[in-house]
Amino acid sequence: MWAGGVGSPRRGMAPAPTDDLFARKLRQPARPPLTPNTFEPRPARGPLLRSGSDAGEVRPPTPASPRARAHSHEDASRPAATPTRLFTDPLALLGLPAEEPEPTFPPVLEPRWFAHYDVQSLLFDWAPRPRGTGSHTEANSGTLAEGQTTTSDLLLGAPGFVSELGGEGELGLGGPISPPVPPALPNAAVSVLEEPQTRTTTYSLEHADLGAGYYRKYFYGKEHQNFFGLDEALGPVAVSLRREEKEGSGGGTLHSYRVIVRTTQLRTLRGTISEDALPPGPPSVSPRKLLEHVAPRLSPTCLRLGSASPKVPRQLLTLDEQVLSFQRKGGILYCRAGQGSEEEMYNNQEAGAAFMQFLTLLGDVVRLKGFESYRAQLDTKTDSTGTHSLYTTYQDHEIMFHVSTMLPYTPNNQQQLLRKRHIGNDIVTIVFQEPGSKPFCPTTIRSHFQHVFLVVRAHAPCTPHTSYRVAVSRTQDTPAFGPALPEGGGPFAANADFRAFLLAKALNGEQAAGHARQFHAMATRTRQQYLQDLATNEVTTTSLDSASRFGLPSLGGRRRATPRSPGADVQAAGALMWGVRAAPGARVAAGAETSGPDDAEVPCLLGISAETLVLVAPRDGRVVFNCACRDVLAWTFSEHQLDLYHGRGEAITLRLDGAPGQAVGEVVARLQLVSRGCETRELALPRDGQGRLGFEVDAEGFITHVERFTFAETTGLRPGARLLRVCGQTLPKLGPETAAQMLRSAPKVCVTVLPPDESGRPRRSFSELYMLSLKEPSRRGGPEPVQDETGKLVILPPTKQLLHFCLKDSSSPPGPGDLTEERTEFLRTHNSLSSGSSLSDEAPVLPNTTPDLLLVTTANPSAPGTDRETPPSQDQSGSPSSHEDTSDSGPELRASILPRTLSLRNSISKIMSEAGSETLEDEWQSISEIASTCNTILESLSREGQPISESGDPKEALKCDSEPEPGSLSEKVSHLESMLWKLQEDLQREKADRAALEEEVRSLRHNNQRLLAESESAATRLLLASKHLGAPTTDLA
């Protein structure tokens, strides 16, 4: 029948009538296309855009005529409603426009060289998308769907909530990752990019907009201009502009403009643009020209200059810092054994012993009457909300807890409204469970404000072995937050570490809940009201065109030159931005792109500042990867792709859009300027006749020995080099055993090698150096370092000459040694940003205002035996030539260690510049303190050389090498830090005292002039009175 019988559909028989609307929609005959005759000119061929597939011909779309658009009932931009698409796209099935696909590469804000101050400035969008549903946000947050229904003995899953029972890890690029160790920051804790962010505690505070203090730090109390207006597309807007001048590294003056653009969206555009990046024009830039370049979508005609009232800066502070709060409140519910409902927990009158033990660990029980610190809406005068409460502080935050058993109890009231009035309005609630309690279900709590529940169950309470387990339940529109729970949610010992973990979890939960739909809408309304008030009541009649310029024009009327090449703009301290597609792992090999599937790549915004490198997913606005620029080890690149190695050798792949080599060249130039990394080398190592590769490598991947006259030596492998990738896989992913097995058994070994530094030492990241410094033996109780009496290892000149070297002007550090950084032919030929030399040679080095003290004291410290990995000569047989080269290594060591003191030069120069106005005695006292600091540097640096024994036996030297060196690098670093900080504090204190003294002198002079004027006036009046009275006149003047 189906092959062509009477009832076959192929015979054209009409289908049976049906009431199904979807079936009718599918059976409608296709409308024939309209082809009217038009006489429109043929459109010019534009640039062809590559589609998602490389196959097939790509043609530019032909615009339809107005008549065709007028007679067509379908949108021309809407794709054809094919049956396949109708079944796969429910919106097309209902006749609705489909969702627009996301671009392959996320768009980047103009202007190109605007340096963003923080992460949320990278996410600023002139046309923000409407917020999606809670499920959409949750899908983007990377949380597994099955986690929403996971249950345990602590927590029951519920619709609309996401459960965290332990082992989820931190959300990163490509999925969950292990939590970072200090000094690295979690992704959610990264905020400010222009300034260094350090992790001083085990648990970091996340989801905090620390960039909100940008106006207070760089605008408030300084000369700047504010403009307010009502834009037709953006609504009320507020713009702040300020011109800055700072001394460049070459001695000239650099001008830049700090800009803040506020709209009704919660993300604010904050950053800096150099004057050299602006179009050529007069020597002074008008606010209109500046905003036309920085904010091209903002209508300049709607802006008016803000009033000079002191209310305006204060209101802008309140507007920007409404997301910053250092006073937090939370609720604590007490659940006895066998309880689980909301009414049962609210009706517990007295606290048990296990609950009191938990409260004592968490904070301090304070008397409310007369309490002067943060009270969290509790009555501190009449005890109407109870007599006591729980209060504590953590990381500069004041936290007041609303404890259910400490709030007033109302008999014969099952709901306990006096208690629920406080706890029900808290965003974060801690549910304490005694052993034997029922699992907590978040749907039993009826509240619109409670978004996060931290369930804590005690085990063996009131014993020396008390421990706790933790589970978390949050609403779907609340993003994930740390610290991450361990597998199974614990157990946690009852100590200070558990207290810090729980308080950090509570603070981060409240910050994360601010991104939920309800609180986001409330914050948006508040922000809109502030902006509306400023644009309506705090403006003058001065338009943007009539506003004064930032700089006074010179008499010569010299115009600003044409903007320099982008190489002069990559020096900005803020984050420059590129649109990339990122994936974990390395994919570029020997200049060829071997990218994997597209679904493994994530569209991201790449931001590189002078301190931090971040990848931000613009779809859900979270950081998926971050690392300090001092942790960048190396990079391998091709025309459109770049592999970045960081930390212990981990790698990520970045794919960039644009002209071949242009965007990649910009990123490489930026990395050369802000990091200590270099380009890698791809080596193919054949085996000799005996199947050997001809080199030795340790467990960390450092080359310890290369045999002479082997293929490894011929290809350029040297001791001190570092293996980053073996046969296409990174070393951290392989592990030492697998990498060794692959090196022994692979028929052809292809490796990615990181060359040693200029002094021949292995390159390590800052995180590795930090961990090595913690592992060094303590100096306390150890012998004092022995001074070398031979005179052959005098590495540095005396302290006076070192101080003179640090303070004198030097445009560039000493030249590199024999091992120079290698560059491929691709960068020389295709990089349009440099001609004849790399951008790192053209652009001056960024001044480091916060010197890396750890890197100053030791360039590349290593574990015992690391120096054995970089012998002074290739020959290890103890020949006379080898001993001769080693004994004459003093000048080489001097040349290698002197550049390491340059990172202190900016800090010492700043201190001396601040002390320039002091008296001669104070100045010499400062110099003596700096000299003592330099003596500490000399002591630590002089012990980095490896002395050779008098017998000249290299084996004896290696034996001495393996013994731990007396002294601790951490103590040297702490001593150096304390000296510098003390010196800076003393200088600041002296400056403050001098300013107060000058103010007192001015006051005395003013009073003296006033008294002198009054005495002259009295003498004049007395003289006039004596004349009128006829008395003999005397000259009283």
Curated annotation (Swiss-Prot):
Q: In which tissues is it expressed?
A: Preferentially expressed in both fetal and adult lymphohematopoietic tissues.
- Topology in membrane: Peripheral membrane protein
Q: Which GO terms describe its biological process?
A: regulation of cell cycle; regulation of small GTPase mediated signal transduction
Is Zinc tagged as a keyword?
no
**PROSITE patterns xref list:** PDZ, RAPGAP
In terms of Gene3D superfamilies, this protein maps to:
2.30.42.10, 6.10.140.210, Rap/Ran-GAP
Q: Which residues form a coiled coil?
A: 968-1025
* Keyword Cell cycle belongs to the record: no
Where does the record place the modification Phosphoserine?
A: 65, 178, 299, 309, 812, 834, 907
Where is composition skewed (Low complexity) in this entry? 871-881
Q: What does the record give under GO molecular function?
A: GTPase activator activity
Instruction: Name the source's superkingdom.
Output: Eukaryota
The record's annotation in Pfam families points to: PDZ, Rap-GAP_dimer, Rap_GAP
GO CC, any one term: endomembrane system
Q: InterPro entries recorded for this chain?
A: PDZ, PDZ_sf, Rap/Ran-GAP_sf, Rap/Ran_GAP_dom, Rap1_Ran_GAP
Q: How does it assemble?
A: Interacts with RRP1B; the interaction leads to inhibition of SIPA1 GTPase activity.
What is the protein's name according to its record? Answer: Signal-induced proliferation-associated protein 1
Please report the organism this UniProt entry assigns to the protein: Mus musculus
